[in-house]
């Protein structure tokens, strides 16, 4: 067994803490009603939702924010596939849509076994084109439910939509491990993060609780290149791949969602009430 001297251990801990504390926050855009669903496109821009205003917006470095869609029906989570197509959870229409580069919109999911979905919220797309999304319900959405459970679903590249898991609490944020072999889901009611193993066909197994208790209500998750989970739940809790909390970033206003982006995928984009922010290490 190798034992570290106290001085070496203290230095290691100090450098480790600096990795998460040496962040510079920039306010990119503001004046929205409630922002959600940041998603970075490989073509060099960020998409985010202004949910109450039914708008999808596009932020490109050095350019004014553009309205991509003004009829997005209560958009929440967004994601891009390898082809640059945009996937959006629409809470008002209770469906998942895909927008191609020409602007054509198609519906991917709106019912399960003949019943309307609750209100799709978080979404992520694998490299092979598999789509996973969460289906909770909040506020007025709860009064119009046809399903008697909250769910996580999988839409394979070919074939019918599948139910990954039923939740008693409301699943919210969703993302992958860096290698795409683990699916992470935040449970807003249980205040935990669950993990599922994914096989080469995208089938999920080994459902388990990875983070037993998050800080606040977990509404968004992003994973960095080291596999650490950045969980938005008011503040930002950072957890290692084993679920151990490494650090907490305290925020003045609650963070609803987060996503990594830009060319090096090391900028953390945050939706904070009516504001969109970016965090990077001070030296970057």
Please report, for each region that a protein language model flagged, where it lies by residue:
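Predominantly a core beta-strand signature of beta-propeller blades
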Residues: 24-25, 63-66, 104-106, 159-163, ...
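Beta-propeller domains
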Residues: 45-69
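A short loop-to-beta-strand structural motif that recurs across blades of beta-propeller domains
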Residues: 55-57, 95-97, 150-153, 192-194, ...
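Short loop/turn segments immediately following beta-strands, especially the blade-tip
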Residues: 196-203, 281-284
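Blade/loop signatures of beta-propeller domains
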Residues: 15-24, 43, 53
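A detector of repeated loop/turn-to-beta-strand junctions in beta-rich toroidal repeat architectures
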Residues: 53, 93, 146-150, 190, ...
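Beta-rich, blade/repeat-based domains predominating
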Residues: 24, 30-45, 71-90, 95, ...
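Bacterial N-terminal signal peptides
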Residues: 3-14
């Amino acid at each position: 067994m190798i034992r570290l001297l106290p001085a070496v251990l203290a230095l290691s801990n100090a450098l480790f803490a600096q990795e998460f504390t040496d962040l510079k926050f920039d306010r990119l855009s503001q004046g929205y009603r409630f922002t959600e669903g940041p998603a970075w496109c490989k073509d060099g821009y960020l998409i985010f939702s202004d949910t109450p205003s039914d708008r999808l917006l596009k932020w490109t470095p050095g350019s004014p924010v553009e309205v991509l869609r003004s009829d997005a029906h209560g958009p929440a989570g967004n994601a891009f596939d390898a082809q640059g197509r945009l996937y959006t959870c629409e809470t008002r229409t209770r469906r998942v849509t895909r927008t191609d580069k020409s602007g054509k919109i198609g519906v991917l999911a709106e019912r399960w076994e003949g019943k309307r979905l609750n209100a799709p919220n978080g979404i992520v797309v694998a490299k092979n084109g598999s789509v996973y999304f969460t289906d909770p319900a909040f506020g007025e959405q709860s009064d119009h439910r046809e399903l008697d459970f909250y769910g996580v679903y999988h839409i394979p590249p070919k074939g019918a939509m599948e139910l990954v898991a039923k939740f008693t609490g409301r699943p919210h944020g969703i993302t992958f491990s860096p290698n795409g072999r683990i699916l992470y889901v935040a449970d807003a009611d249980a205040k935990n993060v669950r993990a599922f193993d994914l096989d080469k066909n995208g089938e999920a197994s080994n459902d388990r609780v990875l983070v037993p208790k998050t800080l606040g209500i977990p509404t968004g998750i992003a994973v960095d290149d080291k596999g650490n989970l950045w969980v938005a739940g008011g503040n930002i809790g950072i957890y290692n791949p084993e679920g151990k909390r490494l650090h907490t970033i305290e925020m003045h206003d609650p963070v609803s969602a987060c996503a990594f982006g830009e060319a090096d995928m090391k900028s953390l984009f945050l939706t904070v009430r009516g504001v969109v922010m970016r965090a990077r290490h001070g030296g970057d």
